[in-house]
Design a protein with these regions (language model features):
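AAA+ P-loop NTPase nucleotide-binding core of proteostasis motors
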Residues: 1-167
Length: 167
């Protein structure tokens, strides 16, 4: 159906998983099925993966590698992430039917930057906001609820005696 439509671009998240996907020993895997369609221009695909996974997996399949072009997306800065959060906080708060304390965005960015180094901005900050609002039973999301979320979801024990409002 995608081939017949001609105006469809497929998006495959974690595209590195198509190599060897569904292929038992000696069988055709997903990447080998799509290669002819890609080479003839019958389908267009955008895939997302990390640079490390791309190099690890696509480097083993030269034919597939030459059918894709790398587009690097840099991680957002702390400042850009805070700008994004400031837009999203009222939207998420309304969705969850909660209010949010002043300064929560900056606090979330600080927590994400310091305690979740293996994840990327803005995703890690948005996840903290989303998870904290989902977990809290109170009407107001405060620093304490963020601390509770960080402990419960991310297993990060923030210092409960520190005055985070001064960040």
């Amino acid at each position: 159906k995608v081939i017949d439509e001609k105006n469809v671009i497929l998006f495959i998240d974690e595209i590195h998983n198509i190599v060897k996907a569904g292929g038992a020993e000696g069988a055709i895997d997903c990447s080998n099925i799509i290669k002819p369609y890609l080479s003839r221009g019958e389908i267009q695909i955008i895939g997302a993966t990390t640079y490390e996974e791309y190099e690890k997996v696509f480097s083993t399949d030269k034919a597939l590698k030459r059918r894709f072009q790398i587009i690097s997306i840099k991680e957002n800065s702390r400042e850009e992430t805070l700008d994004i959060l400031n837009v999203l906080i009222p939207i998420y708060a309304k969705y969850y039917g909660k209010n949010v304390s002043d300064g929560i965005g900056k606090f979330i960015v600080e927590c994400a930057d310091k305690h979740l180094p293996n994840l990327s901005f803005p995703d890690k900050a948005i996840d903290i906001l989303d998870n904290s609002l989902a977990l809290t039973k109170k009407d107001l999301l405060t620093f304490d609820e963020i601390k509770t979320c960080m402990k419960k979801i991310y297993h990060v024990d923030l210092d409960f005696n520190f005055n985070y409002a001064n960040i």
